[in-house]
Amino acid sequence: MNINNFNSAEKILRYTGKLDYFYNSHKTLIVTELDLTNKCNHRCPGCCGHNENNAELSKEQIQSIARNLKAMENRGVILSGGGEPTCSPHFEYAVNLLKNAGQSLGLNSHGMNLNEGLNEIIAQNMEYFRISLDAGSAAMYEKIHGMKSAHFAKTLQNIENFARTKQRLGSKTSFGVGFLTSAVTQGDMEAFVRLVKERGADFAQFRPFISDRLDIIPKLNELREKYEDANFKIVASYQKYKEMAGLRENAERGYAKCHGMFFSTVISADFKVWACLHFRQSEKHFLGDLREQSLEQIWRGQRIREVYNAIECAKCPILCRNDSFNRVLENLSLGVTNSEFL
């Protein structure tokens, strides 16, 4: 069972060719977050998608994106939002097209829309699949997702159904259920783990709400000791939780530039490209419109450099999507005395 250890700081160093492009050329893209749609049938109060509009990518636009990603030698696509990916009428079409373009696929979903047809598509094509549950009770689910107890029960059943489909097909998809931690949600952590394990997921994953600094490491260690076994793991964005301790003592990020924006990007459901998933629809972070330019033209153009120089990292969410990339790449850029003496 292969489970993502969420060690982005180590992963970026595996892409030596991309790092060479970073210093010498333009084909730096490794991973792209793709919003198939801005439509969603949940009402999460803290949603980063903000329900900006009801835009949806057409089949023709998805074709163009697949070609663009292949031309840029992009490696992975995360289907996320924006909205809920499975709300797109072209979900299956997009999955097949992107796979044929050589992309490894991951899916982040609220999980409520699943049926057997979707389960099979996901189990046969995704490297990983994460359902965002964020609760161990119906009351917490309503608070975080804005949905009723019947929807919570349906999602729990869908988790169990997908686990069965995965087993039946012999799928290698890494299947987990996510939980965002904060002072509000911490009381549901154990109940969440118990529910997820009982329904057959491979792992439970903990991540902090953006800018939340709650230390859950002691609780996490307790839960791992109590619930982990050969078939079920508890994982977390450890690098973020560990770095939070440092941020509580020192507000310095360790970098002033968003180097990570060259390696990780966002294509939104209105066919536009953005420097950061946290700032979809922010003019300051707008890189280009795929109606007017190819992805390669955007990466070779002046605008991406202007955005890079204009972003003030001190004003960004702490421990953002590109934080770990930025720390590593900042260190690569530092002058080192007597570097020849390892």
What are these model-predicted stretches?
Residues 1-53, 70-71, 246-253, 262-264, ...:
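N-terminal pre-core extensions flanking Radical SAM catalytic domains
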Residues 38, 87, 113, 137, ...:
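Short, glycine/acidic-enriched loop or turn micro-motifs at the edges of active sites
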Residues 40, 44-47, 94, 98, ...:
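Hydrophobic packing within well-folded, soluble alpha/beta domains
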Residues 48, 81, 109, 179, ...:
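Residue-level recognition of beta-strand->loop/alpha-helix junctions
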Residues 53-108, 112-124:
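Conserved Radical SAM active-site core
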